[in-house]
Amino acid sequence: MYAGDWLTRLTDLARDARNPRQWHVPSNVWGLGVTSMLTDVSSEMVLSILPAYLVMTGGLAPLALGVAAGVHEGGPMLAAWAGGLMADRSGRRKLTAGSGYALSAICRLGWFALSGRTITAIAGLVLVDRMGKALRTAPRDAIISLSVRPDQLATAFGVHRALDAAGAALGPILAFVLLWRMPGRYDVIFFASFVVAVLGVVALALLVEETPEPAAADADRIRLSSRDVFAAFGDAAVRPVLILATAFALVTISDAFVYLLLVQRSHAGAQWIPLLYTGTSVAFLALAVPVGYLADRIGGRGVFVFGHLLLLLAYAAAFGGLTVWPWNAVACVALLGGYYACSDGVLAGIASRVLPAATRAVGLAWVATGVSVGRLCSAIVFGVVWTRAGDRIAVTAFTTALVIVLCAAIATRSTGTAVAS
């Protein structure tokens, strides 16, 4: 983009920012944000302690942690398809999303019942919990996208992701406080997590309304078939978004590995790992809404690619020469928070712009599947390389691959072959 184009866009951005209408967000977005916030409080109370618990207490090798992290990220991808397809075929997106939230709440009760049992049983519950997340994600994002104007998509997703991040920040803090006051009482954390998850389901029922659709969307939904769903993969508008998202996902390092290596190389205690999750979520919370607003004004693709530049800098802070604790940790979590702000909600906004209303949940599921497959593969491969060749070679290989994908994304943008922003 030429400098004059950027100057024009920044001028328009400054003018639009003074318009209160640009910042109005519908109640559905707030309702889903509250639901996600409560659900993430519940989820992160448990999940934030698992990396250190599995490796240091459970004695798992890095390869096993890679498999666990990969399944956590990408294992439930079929559930995402089921959620998207059911939501688009029935038009009952709230009910479909609600079933995913309810499944996760049931898993919290399962964690309480299995307190003190085998790691395998707990890992199985993590998988089912992530299936609940996968089931609800596409219909939830479809509700958000259908509740706002097209020029508010990234802003709306930014508001939702900010509330989601607030929950992700509070969950580890609550777990830390409970263990500090009641050492070893993991059963208390599991039960408290279940109670908060139930409150999330109640919030969805009371605060979120089903999104109305135009008659054209109803007609398209009646004709929607499995063949149409898979044909969306070849859609000229959807495919570049899917390729871009999947390519970056394939070269990312799971947060579990980032935090684990960060504390090991800094000779810090494992008790800091939950607070690293919290720090990342706080940074995400602070940046999600303004970054979403910026993406709506200047285009989402550039913001998305810039987020992965921040990810590269986060890796430099975690794995590079800066080992002065806690400043390396502060830099790492701040940059990771910026990365998530530029990628998570922004990617959903990019995809929503090119997807028709009748198949939006399925289309978003396509993108989520690409990201899940990429993260599944990257986590397993990183674990394999670490186990067989050492963590330094694994980090070097993945950061080099990230640089290559970044250069390719910038090059395709400059030649005009990139996805529309």
Residue positions per predicted region:
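C-terminal membrane-cytosol helix-exit motif in multi-pass small-molecule transporters
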Residues: 195-216, 405-413
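Helix-to-loop junctions at the C-terminal end of transmembrane segments
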Residues: 79-92, 179, 287-300, 386-387
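Juxtamembrane intracellular "pre-TM" segments in multi-pass secondary transporters
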Residues: 2-26, 210-244
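Helix-loop boundary and gating motifs at the non-cytosolic
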Residues: 16-74, 238-276
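Transmembrane alpha-helix termini and helix-breaking/packing motifs in multi-pass membrane transporters
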Residues: 52-57, 170-190, 377-393
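Intracellular juxtamembrane helix-capping segments at the cytosolic ends
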Residues: 135-148, 342-355
